[in-house]
């Protein structure tokens, strides 16, 4: 999970999720794309 100031979708499989005021990008197929904002 990378922590970034700005998160972007890197592939069509990425899903944007908001949890507890934080933005996450989750990808089940390619877990290296997982990101968190903040």
Swiss-Prot record:
Protein name, entry field: Large ribosomal subunit protein bL36
PANTHER family: RIBOSOMAL PROTEIN (PTHR18804:SF16)
Keyword list, A-Z: Ribonucleoprotein, Ribosomal protein
Species name: Phytoplasma mali (strain AT)
InterPro entries documented for this protein: Ribosomal_bL36 (IPR000473), Ribosomal_bL36_sp (IPR035977), Ribosomal_LSU_bL36 (IPR052010)
PROSITE patterns hit by this protein: RIBOSOMAL_L36
One Gene Ontology CC term in the entry: ribonucleoprotein complex
Molecular functions per Gene Ontology: structural constituent of ribosome
Keyword Methyltransferase: no
Entry's family note: Belongs to the bacterial ribosomal protein bL36 family.
Any Pfam family matching the protein: Ribosomal_L36
Gene Ontology annotations of biological process type: translation
């Amino acid at each position: 999970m990378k922590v970034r100031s700005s998160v972007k979708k890197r592939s069509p499989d990425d899903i944007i999720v908001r949890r507890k005021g934080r933005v996450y990008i989750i990808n089940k197929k390619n877990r290296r794309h997982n990101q968190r904002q903040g």
